């Protein structure tokens, strides 16, 4: 049944219907459409459109429809309804007769869909927050396992200074914490109810919009009906949060792809999360990580598509909005999936500790410590930097680590170098000197781990 057929003298073209209908996309809003409809029935009771008995019949009918269809969309999708709103209205009327027609008094699909989308975003954001927290816990588990596992830290993809795998995990925990906080910050925009705004200018029924908002779990109401039905900023906000978080997951994937490569050979991915080559039998490919990296671009596409969709629209509602759900659902589904898969990856990696440490040593990542040692011997940092550079060149020619060079050889470059230099050049010493807050020292890492553990324990 069409919700707007009374104005027209001809039935709509079937090709137009196929092009115009959105049920195949927005059927996912059934929980939210029913939640907002139940709230609306309660407000209609307040303004005496419905009796107490009628409201209860409608509410029970809606709950029954939800129970039958919330986990199985087959019946919904077999319908020829235009969208989830018209499907629900038709189903209610077919179930309880003319009483069902009263439910839509004073309400437009314009404020209805704006409300449903906010309700859906609130539900989805809670699920994503749980995924983020789970991934943080998986990083934390790895961080505790590898407090003493030394790996090279990189700048410009060149070995720079030694760090630990634990420290690397902590870096991603912090990125994910910002992602979680971004979602929490969105609640101020998702917590205002547009329902009661009507088509564009409000409703003539004297409804209590604040009470209506409370019924649905909103903390406040929108202030302007024209803006309320036009607003899709909250979709841009949540997709922006998704895009930033996916960028973090893409960087995580790139790190592990490199660590897994034959050139680095720091980690091994489990057979259960890798694939092979149809031609080259020796291959064990990190497809799972490459797909996370690739799917980042899909989420960017969802965000940019929403910007493009909205940029030229006049106030207020336009049919262009029908496409917003494609971008919203796709972007957030990918984000949630990638968070889940990232957790799977962290449960299926094995570190090659000796390879990691050897790479840190041969990368001369302790060169900065040698330069700082010379500064403490009274040499200016610039001269110390120059002397250390010369020693590194000599080490490379000898194919030795700095700590493997004998004292007489080192003294050729600076007579102030003494036997105590070796205690400064060990990678463990390099790490533990970085004892500033947030540094890589064993002490600071343990402090950070305890702080993260305490923070995450509040969500259990």
UniProtKB/Swiss-Prot annotation:
The protein's matches in SUPFAM superfamilies, at most eight in alphabetical order, are given as:
L-aspartase-like
Q: What are the transmembrane regions?
A: none
Listed under GO cellular component are:
cytosol
Q: Where in the cell is it found?
A: Cytoplasm
Question: Where is this protein chiefly located?
Answer: cytoplasm
What pathway does this protein act in? Amino-acid biosynthesis; L-arginine biosynthesis; L-arginine from L-ornithine and carbamoyl phosphate: step 3/3
Q: Does the keyword Cytoplasm apply?
A: yes
Q: Output the HAMAP family linked to this UniProt entry.
A: Arg_succ_lyase
Which protein is depicted? Answer: Argininosuccinate lyase
Name the species this protein comes from: Buchnera aphidicola subsp. Cinara cedri (strain Cc)
The gene name on file is: argH
